[in-house]
Swiss-Prot record:
The first transmembrane domain may act as a type I signal anchor. The PAL motif is required for normal active site conformation. The gene is SPP2. This is Signal peptide peptidase 2. Its EC number is 3.4.23.-. One of its GO terms (molecular function) is aspartic endopeptidase activity, intramembrane cleaving. Residues 41-62, 111-141, 187-188, 252-266, 312-343 are cytoplasmic. Residues 324-343 are annotated as: Disordered. One of its GO terms (cellular component) is cytoplasmic side of endoplasmic reticulum membrane. A motif (PAL) lies at residues 290-292. It holds the Pfam family Peptidase_A22B. Belongs to the peptidase A22B family.
Amino acid sequence: MKTHERAANLALAGLSLAPLVVKVNPNANVILTACLAVYVGCYRSVKPTPPAETMSKEHAMRFPLVGSAMLLSLFLLFKFLSKDLVNTVLTAYFFILGIAALCATLLPSIKRFLPKEWNDNAIVWRAPLFHSLSVEFTRSQVVASIPGFFFCIWYAAKKHWLANNVLGISFCIQGIEMLSLGSFKTGAILLSGLFFYDIFWVFFTPVMVSVAKSFDAPIKLLFPTGDAARPFSMLGLGDIVIPGIFVALALRFDVSRGIKNRYFNSAFLGYTVGLTVTIIVMNWFQAAQPALLYIVPGVIGFVAVHCLWNGEVKPLLEYNESKAEEEEACEEDTDSKQNKKKE
């Protein structure tokens, strides 16, 4: 982990804890926390191989429709079923997800302090009655899951804003780290679709705001305001993860070309500007705003202007992580065959 990455992790942890001891401006807290989560997730996504999950253009086109169906389903569940019952089921679901997400987030930091065999030697556990079902894990993962277990217990019991945010930030970092858009074309399709999705569900229906207020699970970050009438400002995790995976793609594009953070800086600046404009407009009108309405033009616009200015539209549009992975695999096979012939 590089110095700037370590500094970002420490800053994110400190900012999360700060409202416990001092009054933090909620607007500044929203912007700084979201930007730090994106920054950390982006750098964690830079690995020898591309992220495990890559989105296709077809998936990107369908995503707003699937998201709309899920959002409407949740709205109807809260409307026709007991709110407490729905949230109890969701809490149990997110309890398991929270342990896994926080474990994966903490693991790289914890591994450095544990014996090598704890990191390398896997333990296989098989279900007593169903031997075909097995789980593989290391001792390091067990150690890393302990904080996640206690945070999930705390969240389930108290629904404290800090426990909510720790789990929510973990989901954001893991989402940005593990998901890949594959190409900038796919990213543009996804962000454009969600741009209209966010506008429709926030401005033209009460569904988005109603679900956000009723959904008592770590799908949003909460920022204390000190105002009894409105105790928390909120930011949905989707407003961090969705643009975040586009910013992460820009960073990996820079790394693949051996250049230092040129397009990453543009995308990250676009995200910061877009989120800042969201907060300004929200406070001006004193009403909920679809964050992607401002973030999407910021992220795509800054990257587009940058590549047009540099005359690099073609390499940016042709970049595809899955093809890059295949080319690397072919090169490795060729090298291994040549080495065998020499032997």
